[in-house]
C-alpha cells in the first residue's frame, strides 16, 4: 500500500499524459505530435515511467498504471 502511494506522487502529470497515449497504442512520434514535444522527450518520459513503475515494457507500464489507478 505504501508503494502505491509513493508511485502516485512520483509519476508526473506529463508522464501520465504519455501513459494515456501509450494506452491508446500511439507510437513515440504520434505522442510527440499530440503533446507538442520532441520524440526524444517522449522517450525520456517513457524511460522514467518504466523505472518508476518497475515495468519491463510499455504494455506492462500501462497495465501497472491502470492497476495503481494512475490512469483509467
Regions found by a protein language model. Give the residues of each.
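Small/flexible residues
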Residues: 11, 42-43, 60, 70
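Helix-turn-helix DNA-binding segment
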Residues: 2-41
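Residues within the DNA-recognition helix of helix-turn-helix
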Residues: 14, 45-48
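Basic, Lys/Arg-enriched C-terminal extension of HTH/homeodomain DNA-binding domains
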Residues: 51-72
Amino acid at each position: 500500500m505504501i508503494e502505491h502511494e509513493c508511485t502516485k506522487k512520483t509519476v508526473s502529470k506529463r508522464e501520465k499524459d504519455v501513459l494515456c497515449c501509450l494506452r491508446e497504442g500511439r507510437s513515440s512520434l504520434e505522442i510527440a505530435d499530440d503533446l507538442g514535444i520532441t520524440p526524444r522527450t517522449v522517450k525520456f518520459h517513457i524511460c522514467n515511467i518504466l523505472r518508476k513503475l518497475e515495468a519491463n515494457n510499455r504494455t506492462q507500464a500501462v497495465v501497472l498504471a491502470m492497476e495503481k489507478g494512475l490512469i483509467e
